[in-house]
């Protein structure tokens, strides 16, 4: 077995040893896995420990605990802890491992893994042709390149949401939805919603459960403020709920939208070129983020957040059936790009702005006092490189408190950068360029999913 594959196998044995009652597995933790953890703060340099040291440790361990000695039950539990990419590589050369892909007990073991490092499904300008993902475990690009990834008659389907191990697509013509596991290729059409009185769709959100059997929920927000409503699709019932109205709740620090509904609400400001400009309330969204939203689920409430057409953050409480607009972070006369993400049940705002001849990219969250608190900032040396590019940011939150920021500037100068921020380690990483047939591939946005073989539609 290659040393790198064996090393990953050892890590999966470590995970099993932490939960198993087998004396053989329990002793693994004590004998081989007391390693100090190092944390790099700031911008990651990606340093690794000595290859010789790792290979010596792996060779010794493999001779002590050969895999052939593991029974099927223990083997499947070990395999379930493997990173998904490693499992696919290793199962391709071992019939015994390959057969586990269809095993119900193996899928059950996989479903009991609390979380997996996220994969980022990248979306280019031609949203329905995307097939590249970034594997955050191995820090590498992968081309799913499945001939059946989306059938030719489904080229009008655009990725709009994700949760767990599933991606959600929406047909730009009919409005129908399609759920898909990008790893296995399994898919399912979602029945059409009943007539929604031609209300414009504002947002699509999705949640999943990893328990067996797995289930998922789709939420759609429709209408125009202040007349919003929502519908919920439950996979267990295979049906949509009735259209439910959302009541508007006003706050003293609520959005500036009301001020701009009056004739006297127009704001003028002086641009850098010395021209008088009218502040616009019209938010320009990337087509790939047209229905983008995030959903947070707690014991008290389910809340869907999305950006309104005039740039405010709308919070829709599905439990109380009401919505409110959150206070803006910046006044309308400042040019900026904004997006929302969710990590571990918390909504974050990513904001790119230019001020005093420099660019600033910051991450914010709303505290209990409804005040914005900064939780992260791209190092100034990097953010300054984005200055003057007139670019847009599209972001997504992933499992493990990771946030991907896609920066892209439109022609005449195409300029794309991709940054990942770890909220826990407070560490930024820039993703390498992605290449196909020797040419760089550019992306405008992404969706985050966990690579779960067991996720069913």
Swiss-Prot record:
Residues 64-110 form the F-box domain. InterPro entries: F-box-like_dom_sf, F-box_dom, Gal_Oxase/kelch_b-propeller, KIB1-4_b-propeller, SCF_F-box_component. Pfam families: Beta-prop_KIB1-4, F-box. Gene3D superfamilies: 1.20.1280.50. SMART domains: FBOX. Signal peptide: none annotated. This is F-box only protein 13. It comes from Arabidopsis thaliana (Mouse-ear cress).
């Amino acid at each position: 077995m290659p040393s790198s594959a064996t090393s990953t196998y050892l890590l999966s044995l470590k995970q099993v040893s932490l939960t198993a009652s087998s004396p053989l597995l329990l002793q693994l933790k004590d004998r081989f896995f007391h390693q100090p953890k190092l944390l790099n703060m700031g911008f990651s340099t990606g340093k690794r420990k000595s290859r010789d040291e790792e290979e010596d440790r792996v060779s010794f361990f493999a001779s002590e605990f050969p895999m052939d000695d593991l029974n099927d039950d223990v083997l499947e539990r070990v395999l379930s802890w493997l990173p998904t990419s490693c499992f696919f590589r290793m199962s391709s050369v071992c019939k015994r491992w390959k057969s586990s892909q269809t095993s119900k007990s193996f899928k059950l073991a996989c479903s009991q893994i609390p979380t997996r490092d996220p994969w980022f499904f990248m979306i280019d300008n031609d949203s329905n042709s995307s097939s590249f993902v970034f594997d955050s475990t191995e820090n590498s690009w992968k081309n799913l390149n499945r001939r059946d990834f989306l059938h030719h008659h489904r080229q009008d389907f655009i990725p709009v949401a994700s949760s767990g191990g599933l991606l959600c697509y929406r047909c730009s013509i009919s409005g129908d939805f399609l759920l898909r596991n990008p790893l296995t290729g399994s898919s399912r059409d979602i029945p059409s919603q009943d007539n929604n009185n031609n209300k414009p769709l504002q947002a699509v959100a999705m949640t999943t459960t990893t328990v067996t059997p797995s289930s998922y929920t789709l939420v759609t927000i429709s209408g125009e403020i202040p007349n919003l409503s929502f519908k919920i699709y439950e996979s267990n019932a295979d049906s949509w709920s009735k259209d439910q109205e959302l009541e508007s709740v006003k706050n003293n620090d609520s959005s500036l939208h009301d001020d701009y509904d009056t004739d006297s609400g127009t704001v003028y400001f002086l641009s850098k070129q010395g021209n008088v400009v009218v502040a616009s309330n019209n938010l320009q969204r990337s087509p790939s983020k047209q229905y983008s939203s995030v959903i947070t689920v707690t014991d008290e409430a389910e809340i869907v957040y999305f950006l309104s057409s005039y740039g405010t953050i709308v919070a829709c409480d599905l439990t109380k059936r009401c919505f409110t607009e959150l206070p803006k972070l910046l006044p309308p006369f400042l040019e900026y790009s904004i997006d929302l993400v969710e990590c571990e049940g918390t909504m974050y705002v990513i904001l790119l702005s230019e001020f005093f001849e420099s660019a600033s990219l910051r991450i914010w969250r709303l505290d209990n006092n409804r005040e914005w608190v900064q939780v992260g900032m791209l190092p100034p040396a990097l953010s300054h490189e984005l200055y003057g590019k007139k670019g847009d940011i599209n972001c997504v939150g992933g499992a493990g408190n990771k946030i991907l920021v896609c920066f892209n500037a439109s022609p005449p100068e195409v300029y794309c950068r991709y940054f990942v921020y770890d909220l826990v380690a407070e560490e930024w990483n820039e993703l390498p360029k992605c290449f196909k047939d020797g040419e760089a591939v550019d992306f405008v946005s992404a969706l985050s999913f966990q690579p779960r073989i067991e996720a069913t539609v």
